[in-house]
Amino acid sequence: MVFQEKVIDKVFPETVFNQLVSVCKRQYKRFPYAEEFGRYFINDKEWTALQIYTSPLLGLAREIFDSTTLEHSYSIFAHYEGNQAQLPKHKDNNACTYTLDVCLYQQTPWSLWVEGKEYFLEENQGLAFYGEDQEHWRENFPNPVNNQVGQLFVHFVEPDHWFFGGKDA
């Protein structure tokens, strides 16, 4: 697949975005903590309230990725903090063909690298890329003593993807 990553401004309307950030900041300590990534995280199957915010993004994703058939697979909210916060180089191996990473909040920006290109996202900006095909990572977590970074990972796949029991099952 040939796709040029795209930065998307104002992923959410301002009032919706502010509500999402407020809910995530209040709730993150209730979610599982993954020591290997230095993050609290939860998916939208376990925290169904997240679906209120991610479901409306389907139309935007279809437009960005130029596919009228893609479907939402799952989303994850992640809150990174401390010395262990990291995201090593990887390609996704789950139902992440189309990925929209949205910056919810940050005290110090933490850039995202995709295929060797660095992206600094502002709050309510997203980066669209092919999560399963494009290597992506983050470098050292900036200001680990004070920094907190909230990210929303929204993933989409085609209907014949194994996630939906399709040809790749």
Model-derived features with residue positions:
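Catalytic core of non-heme Fe(II) oxygenases with the double-stranded beta-helix
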Residues: 80-139, 145-152, 157-168
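Conserved double-stranded beta-helix
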Residues: 40-43, 47, 53-111
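Non-heme Fe(II)/2-oxoglutarate
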Residues: 1-65
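Structural/interface elements that position substrates and couple domains in central-metabolism enzymes
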Residues: 4, 22, 70, 74-75, ...
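Short helix-terminating capping/connector loops at secondary-structure junctions
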Residues: 35, 70, 146-147
